């Protein structure tokens, strides 16, 4: 069964709904250079993630301008893990891991398997996403799940499938790609970063149903 991350949380009520639905991880977005209704400031990110209970992974999703700034954010916000988007080098990922002893997830474009292979065993997990030109996710666009599954088979690092997932298609995506985890943000929203709690619950349930939609 694929693990589930509910991302782009901006309110305590939405965070609690994700946890109550059984999400394995929750994500808060801060310091990204793109316009997003899901972005919160670092203080709000710290406040939200401080309420995450044990056994649920509190994840900071960010695009800082340097590895040093990523370390600063980790020390300020204190998440369990950081998910990085944008352009990074293997040495920068190693630096962040060494300085903070936090798990580092790296988002890579689904159309760039060579980059995923470059960071295999460097990042703690690879988020295979549909990214825009800046490397940001949250596009709401799907990609070839079977090809993502073939890539995952070649990698050692766990693969998190993202990009255009919803409660209605996540079971099919899991069946096709067999990822370690799935990640959703816009696919379970009402509007402006506010989550649809029913969609969140259905997404978590359906992620565990490879052949059947709830």
From Swiss-Prot:
PANTHER family registered for this protein in UniProt: N-(5'-PHOSPHORIBOSYL)ANTHRANILATE ISOMERASE
Name of the featured protein: N-(5'-phosphoribosyl)anthranilate isomerase
Gene: trpF
Superkingdom of source: Archaea
Reactions listed under catalytic activity: N-(5-phospho-beta-D-ribosyl)anthranilate = 1-(2-carboxyphenylamino)-1-deoxy-D-ribulose 5-phosphate
Record has Lyase as a keyword: no
EC primary class: isomerase
Disulfide-bond pairs as recorded: none
UniProt pathway: Amino-acid biosynthesis; L-tryptophan biosynthesis; L-tryptophan from chorismate: step 3/5
GO molecular function, one term: phosphoribosylanthranilate isomerase activity
EC number: 5.3.1.24
Keywords: Amino-acid biosynthesis, Aromatic amino acid biosynthesis, Isomerase, Tryptophan biosynthesis
């Amino acid at each position: 069964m694929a693990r589930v991350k509910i991302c782009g949380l901006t309110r305590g009520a939405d965070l609690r709904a994700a946890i109550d639905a059984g999400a394995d991880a929750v994500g808060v977005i801060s310091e990204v250079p793109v316009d997003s209704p899901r972005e919160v400031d670092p203080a709000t990110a710290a406040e939200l993630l401080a309420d995450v209970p044990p056994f649920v992974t509190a994840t900071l999703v960010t695009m800082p301008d340097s590895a040093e700034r990523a370390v600063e954010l980790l020390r300020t916000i204190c998440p369990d893990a950081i998910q990085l988007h944008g352009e990074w080098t293997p040495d920068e990922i190693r630096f962040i891991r060494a300085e903070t002893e936090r798990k580092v997830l790296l988002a890579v474009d689904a159309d760039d398997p060579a980059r995923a292979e470059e960071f295999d065993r460097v990042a703690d997990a690879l988020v295979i996403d549909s990214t825009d030109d800046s490397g940001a996710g949250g596009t709401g666009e799907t990609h070839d799940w079977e090809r993502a599954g073939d890539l995952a088979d070649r990698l050692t690092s766990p693969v998190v499938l993202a990009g255009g997932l919803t409660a209605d298609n996540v079971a099919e995506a899991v069946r096709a790609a067999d990822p370690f985890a799935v990640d959703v943000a816009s696919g379970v929203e009402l509007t402006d970063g506010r989550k649809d709690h029913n969609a969140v619950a259905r997404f978590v349930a359906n992620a565990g149903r490879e052949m059947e939609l709830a």
